[in-house]
């Protein structure tokens, strides 16, 4: 009996039932009833955005794989700077956006430059607080394997010097000079010239002009005080540089004893001479103008004067920038 009943049930699955007039079609046994009405649907771990203007959730988009998303995110933050300049969002914003100095897209890098200009025009002190991170990634860009990233590195340096030049030259005077020499292809003291970029006439003159202008600004901030930059009076500068200032005055900048490195740990450089890095210069504190000028005269000035003479003879925009740099060097060191 049981076997015959199962056979009948199996046969019913393959039989087409006759529809009767006036009666609806029967529903399947596994049909789901969707006729219920609910006022709310609760989904775990999913919440509606209560504040559509909250920019903290956009920070992760700065690491998005799409170039347009990164660019649009930088533009959004740039437009929002006036309203968030005094908020706690600035620190994570700069921490997430500064690595874009080495971004593969030129549009993203230009968007970051515009963002830095917008922040600096509202409050330059914020850029000064993140000066170390800026210098770190600028140095990385100067030695980057991609030529375009390397060429744009001095753009970031020029814009950073415009808002916090004194902070930059005090902390990384020698490193930045070595980096600018590298992108110009001039070779540095203690290094092989073939290791740097070879300077040829085929190189884009536009980028050479940008590099020379960045070097001009770096030397201007590193070897001149604020009064000399504004007035252009060299006599007062040389007179004041030799006088002993009151050591008990409140310093003009934060962390005046940072160069002593009392609470920092540094990695030991093994065989620094063989690697081509002058460890003495890199560890030298360049807090004052006199020290920076002495380092520049001893290590960099002869090379700069030799190279700019060649560029001046070639003429063009590069020649103008080189002549401008030559005038500055004569004003400071002659």
UniProtKB/Swiss-Prot annotation:
SUPFAM superfamilies: ARM repeat. GO terms for biological process: maturation of LSU-rRNA from tricistronic rRNA transcript (SSU-rRNA, 5.8S rRNA, LSU-rRNA); pre-replicative complex assembly involved in nuclear cell cycle DNA replication; regulation of DNA-templated DNA replication initiation; ribosomal large subunit assembly; rRNA processing. Keywords: Nucleus, Ribosome biogenesis, rRNA processing. GO terms for cellular component: cytosol; nucleoplasm; nucleus; rixosome complex. One of its GO terms (molecular function) is chromatin binding. It is found in: Nucleus. It comes from the Eukaryota. Residues 1-32 are annotated as: Disordered. InterPro entries: ARM-like, ARM-type_fold, Ipi1_N. Belongs to the IPI1/TEX10 family. Component of the RIX1 complex required for processing of ITS2 sequences from 35S pre-rRNA. Present with 4420 molecules/cell in log phase SD medium. Component of the RIX1 complex, composed of IPI1, RIX1/IPI2 and IPI3 in a 1:2:2 stoichiometry. The complex interacts (via RIX1) with MDN1 (via its hexameric AAA ATPase ring) and the pre-60S ribosome particles. This is Pre-rRNA-processing protein IPI1. It comes from Saccharomyces cerevisiae (strain ATCC 204508 / S288c).
């Amino acid at each position: 009996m049981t076997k015959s009943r199962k056979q009948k049930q199996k046969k019913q699955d393959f039989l087409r039932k006759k529809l009767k007039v006036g009666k609806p079609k029967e529903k399947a046994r596994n049909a789901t009833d969707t006729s219920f009405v609910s006022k709310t649907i609760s989904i775990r771990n999913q919440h509606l955005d209560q504040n559509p203007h909250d920019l903290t959730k956009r920070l992760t988009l700065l690491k998005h794989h799409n170039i347009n998303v990164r660019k649009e995110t930088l533009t959004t933050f740039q437009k929002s700077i006036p309203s968030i300049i005094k908020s706690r969002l600035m620190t994570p914003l700069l921490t997430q956006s500064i690595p874009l100095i080495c971004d593969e897209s030129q549009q993203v890098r230009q968007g970051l430059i515009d963002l830095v200009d917008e922040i600096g025009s509202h409050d330059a002190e914020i850029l000064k607080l993140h000066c170390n991170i800026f210098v770190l990634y600028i140095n990385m860009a100067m030695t980057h394997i991609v030529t375009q990233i390397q060429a744009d590195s001095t753009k970031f340096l020029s814009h950073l010097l415009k808002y916090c030049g004194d902070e930059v030259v005090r902390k990384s005077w020698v490193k930045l000079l070595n980096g600018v020499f590298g992108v110009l292809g001039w070779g540095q003291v203690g290094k092989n010239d073939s290791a740097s970029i070879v300077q040829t006439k085929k190189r884009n003159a536009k980028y050479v002009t940008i590099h020379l202008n960045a070097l001009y600004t770096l030397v201007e901030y590193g070897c001149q005080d604020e009064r000399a930059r504004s007035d252009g009076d060299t006599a007062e500068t040389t007179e004041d540089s030799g006088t002993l200032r009151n050591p008990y005055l409140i310093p003009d900048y934060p962390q005046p004893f940072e160069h002593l490195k009392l609470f920092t740990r540094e990695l030991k450089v093994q065989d620094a001479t063989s690697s081509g890095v002058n460890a003495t210069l890199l560890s030298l504190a360049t807090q004052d103008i006199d020290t920076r000028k002495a380092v520049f005269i001893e290590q960099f000035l002869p090379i700069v004067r030799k190279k700019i003479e060649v560029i001046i003879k070639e003429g063009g925009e590069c020649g103008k920038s080189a002549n401008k740099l030559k005038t500055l060097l004569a004003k400071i060191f002659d």
